């Protein structure tokens, strides 16, 4: 066994403590992910001369953060948790970071739920602030991937969302068994790779909303593939054809992404023809 294989034995998921409260690396990575996403948004606004002010972006990120947290938490409870009745009768426990008097943080977040919360928050923000919805979503498509990268690194450091059992040399020892570091696969594919693709693809953007559609399509494909190397949630298991819930949700995302792309493309072509005839 190499140091890498046994890295969890040498690594503490708790970064430090403040007045008895344990601060986990996952929490730090989550904050870093938000800061990186905001920085990237400002970077592309300046680089591509987009019509969004810093004040608009900062206000928007507050709205989005609230939407993402609510969506991620409620999404986990509704989709992945087997304690829906408990939370329905004890709603104050949904965001309770304490257990038996000890601070343990809020565990259980769903990315697909976060996406729903993100979309709702974005729609409400654009309606209230009179912003271009699809243009803002395109900016998010460029900003999210690198933030997502740090989020998955946080999952790895927090020793959660393990991969399936493997015999590859780079496997991570978890409870006596080597497992795929699937969190790192996702960080690279759904984070770095998608960012690089969109970074260069944006130069060929033909209509507002195109980048967010491409992001959704790419994420769905990569998530579907990496799920084959990721252990399914114990309380849910696998469905028909050995597919996980994450893969099933990714199929819906893929359909949604392609459908939105086709609709927006047709709308763009119709608008171009109308403008040509008008001139």
UniProtKB/Swiss-Prot annotation:
Primary location class: membrane
Membrane topology of this protein: Multi-pass membrane protein
Binding site for a 1,2-diacyl-sn-glycero-3-phospho-(1'-sn-glycerol): 152
Pathway assigned in UniProt: Protein modification; lipoprotein biosynthesis (diacylglyceryl transfer)
Record's subcellular location: Cell inner membrane
Family matches, as InterPro entries: Lgt
Residues annotated as transmembrane: 25-45, 60-80, 103-123, 133-153, 181-201, 209-229, 236-256
Keyword Transport annotated: no
Gene Ontology annotations of biological process type: lipoprotein biosynthetic process
GO molecular function: phosphatidylglycerol-prolipoprotein diacylglyceryl transferase activity
Keywords assigned: Cell inner membrane, Cell membrane, Membrane, Transferase, Transmembrane, Transmembrane helix
Uppermost EC category: transferase
Record-level GO cellular component terms: plasma membrane
NCBIfam families, alphabetized: lgt (TIGR00544)
PANTHER family: PHOSPHATIDYLGLYCEROL--PROLIPOPROTEIN DIACYLGLYCERYL TRANSFERASE (PTHR30589:SF0), PROLIPOPROTEIN DIACYLGLYCERYL TRANSFERASE (PTHR30589)
Function: Catalyzes the transfer of the diacylglyceryl group from phosphatidylglycerol to the sulfhydryl group of the N-terminal cysteine of a prolipoprotein, the first step in the formation of mature lipoproteins.
Family: Belongs to the Lgt family.
The protein's name: Phosphatidylglycerol--prolipoprotein diacylglyceryl transferase
């Amino acid at each position: 066994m190499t140091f890498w294989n046994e890295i969890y034995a040498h690594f503490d998921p708790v970064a430090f403590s403040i007045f008895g409260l344990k601060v986990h690396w996952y929490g730090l990575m989550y904050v870093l992910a938000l800061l990186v996403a905001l920085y990237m948004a400002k970077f592309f606004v300046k680089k591509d001369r987009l019509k969004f002010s810093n004040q608009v972006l900062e206000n928007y990120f507050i709205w989005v953060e609230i939407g993402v947290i609510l969506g991620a938490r409620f999404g986990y409870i509704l989709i992945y948790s087997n304690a829906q009745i408990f939370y329905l009768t004890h709603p104050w426990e949904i965001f309770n970071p304490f257990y038996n008097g000890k601070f343990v943080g809020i565990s259980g977040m769903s990315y697909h739920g976060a996406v729903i919360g993100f979309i709702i928050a974005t729609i409400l923000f654009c309606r209230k602030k009179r912003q271009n919805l699809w243009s803002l979503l395109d900016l998010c498509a460029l900003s999210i991937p690198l933030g997502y990268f740090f989020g998955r690194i946080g999952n790895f450091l927090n020793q959660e969302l393990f991969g399936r059992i493997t015999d590859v040399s780079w496997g991570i020892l978890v409870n006596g068994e080597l497992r795929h570091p699937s969190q790192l696969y996702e960080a690279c594919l759904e984070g770095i790779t998608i960012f690089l693709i969109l970074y260069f693809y944006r130069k060929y953007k033909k209509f507002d909303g195109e980048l967010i559609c491409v992001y959704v399509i790419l994420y769905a494909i990569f998530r579907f593939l990496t799920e084959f190397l990721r252990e399914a949630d114990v309380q849910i298991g696998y469905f028909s054809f050995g597919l996980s819930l994450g893969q099933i949700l990714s199929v819906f995302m893929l359909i949604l992404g392609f459908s939105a792309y086709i609709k927006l493309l047709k709308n763009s072509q119709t608008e171009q023809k109308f403008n040509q005839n008008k001139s």
